[in-house]
Amino acid sequence: MLYPALLCAALLLIAPLGHTEGRTLYPSPDAIQFVEQFLDRYNDLTLDDLENLVSSQPEEPSSAFTSGVKIAEYPKWADIPAQGDSTWLRLLKGTLANQKRAVTDRSRRGWNRGCFGLKLDRIGSMSGLGC
């Protein structure tokens, strides 16, 4: 009963002694350039700009259906986009909507209650020191 435990412990101690080589992954210059161009282009967009972009795009059939695959052969579990929005535009629109919602949530919470904030005012009211 003690032998399997000793064998496992010995294997665990010996395993790191083997020489292993790792390769460092570097980002592709093309990927970095793409991200920089993407951020330069879409950095100052507002939600209205995104809606204008979406409405100005021509309706294109989905690439899955242009390859000759009939709709009846397409699996039922596959999501077919209801709108002609591209994935990037929907992502950006959702992000901008979340930013606007975060600003209103922050103002609704009322971070600046009292003299020193909610926690310190609570401590001050319990101790009777107040502001």
From Swiss-Prot:
GO terms for biological process: blood vessel diameter maintenance; cGMP biosynthetic process; receptor guanylyl cyclase signaling pathway. The keyword Metal-binding does not apply. Residues 23-109 form a propeptide. GO terms for cellular component: extracellular region. Keywords: Cleavage on pair of basic residues, Disulfide bond, Hormone, Secreted, Signal, Vasoactive. SMART domains: NAT_PEP. Its main location: secreted. Expressed in brain and to a low extent in atrium. The keyword Chaperone does not apply. GO terms for molecular function: hormone activity. Exhibits natriuretic and vasodepressor activity. Has a cGMP-stimulating activity. Belongs to the natriuretic peptide family. PANTHER family: C-TYPE NATRIURETIC PEPTIDE, NATRIURETIC PEPTIDE C-LIKE PROTEIN. This is C-type natriuretic peptide 2. It comes from Oncorhynchus mykiss. The lineage of its organism: Eukaryota, Metazoa, Chordata, Craniata, Vertebrata.
